[in-house]
């Protein structure tokens, strides 16, 4: 007896997703969330959502931040670790770029010396607006161990405006990822058009 495949003209229909059912109500969890209910009602009535252009631009910008590495010392190792598969910063819409002209965010990680300060400013000036800076680690925040050295800038905020400070020596990859999430929250709160 040979096995022959049977073909049917009826379409295969997947069962409706149930999600996680709340045993008290018998409905999916979050089914009575007022935010999702209003979005669902608006989509059902009109077929589209209405929002302001500023909110749409802020939403798109927070989901597509491109960062440029400016690793000056040992903090750069944690910055590289943040982009590896264990933490995977790209799932938050935070992807690395090699050129300042394609970057929205610059992460200054490490000790900034007086000789390197003009190069940092030059790279910052090449970034398109709106641009953001994350200062990572004690050395970038305020000089760190080398605060009293004649050749060290006591904080990169003396050269470029800093939006987020990530403390630590070196800060962990989780701390830097939290700083990225804080930057996204700041962009949503302040906006990009006013900046």
Swiss-Prot record:
Membrane topology of this protein: Peripheral membrane protein
Compartments where located: Cell inner membrane
GO BP terms, alphabetized: aerobic respiration; electron transport coupled proton transport
Binding site residues for [4Fe-4S] cluster: 74-75, 139, 169
Cofactor binding mode and count: Binds 1 [4Fe-4S] cluster.
InterPro entries (alphabetical): NADH_UbQ_OxRdtase-like_20kDa, NADH_UQ_OxRdtase_20Kd_su
Annotated GO MF terms: 4 iron, 4 sulfur cluster binding; iron ion binding; NADH dehydrogenase (ubiquinone) activity; NADH:ubiquinone reductase (non-electrogenic) activity; quinone binding
Cofactor(s) needed by this chain: [4Fe-4S] cluster
Pfam families in the record: Oxidored_q6
Keywords noted in UniProt: 4Fe-4S, Cell inner membrane, Cell membrane, Iron, Iron-sulfur, Membrane, Metal-binding, NAD, Quinone, Translocase, Transport, Ubiquinone
Cellular component annotations (GO), alphabetically ordered: plasma membrane; respiratory chain complex I
EC number: 7.1.1.-
Catalytic activity: a quinone + NADH + 5 H(+)(in) = a quinol + NAD(+) + 4 H(+)(out)
Cross-referenced NCBIfam families: nuoB_fam (TIGR01957), PRK06411.1 (NF005012)
The protein's assembly and partners: NDH-1 is composed of 14 different subunits. Subunits NuoB, C, D, E, F, and G constitute the peripheral sector of the complex.
Function: NDH-1 shuttles electrons from NADH, via FMN and iron-sulfur (Fe-S) centers, to quinones in the respiratory chain. The immediate electron acceptor for the enzyme in this species is believed to be ubiquinone. Couples the redox reaction to proton translocation (for every two electrons transferred, four hydrogen ions are translocated across the cytoplasmic membrane), and thus conserves the redox energy in a proton gradient.
Family of this protein: Belongs to the complex I 20 kDa subunit family.
Protein's UniProt name: NADH-quinone oxidoreductase subunit B
Organism: Methylorubrum extorquens (strain PA1)
């Amino acid at each position: 007896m040979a096995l022959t495949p049977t073909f049917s003209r009826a379409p295969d229909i997947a069962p409706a997703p149930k999600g996680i059912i709340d045993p008290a109500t018998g409905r999916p969890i979050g089914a009575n969330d007022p935010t999702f209910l209003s979005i669902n009602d608006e989509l059902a009535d009109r077929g589209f959502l209405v929002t302001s252009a500023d909110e749409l631009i802020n939403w798109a910008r927070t989901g597509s931040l491109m960062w440029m590495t400016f690793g000056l010392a040992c903090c750069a190792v944690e910055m590289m670790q943040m982009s590896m598969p264990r933490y995977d910063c790209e799932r938050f819409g935070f992807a690395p770029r090699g050129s300042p002209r394609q970057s929205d965010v610059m992460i200054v990680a490490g000790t900034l010396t007086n000789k390197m300060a003009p190069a940092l400013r030059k790279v910052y000036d090449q970034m398109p607006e709106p641009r953001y800076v994350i200062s990572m680690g004690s050395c970038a925040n305020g000089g760190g161990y080398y605060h009293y050295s004649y050749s060290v800038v006591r904080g990169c905020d003396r050269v470029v405006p800093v939006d987020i400070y990530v403390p630590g020596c070196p800060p962990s990859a989780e701390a830097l990822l939290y700083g990225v999430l804080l930057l996204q929250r700041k962009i949503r709160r302040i906006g990009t058009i006013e900046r």
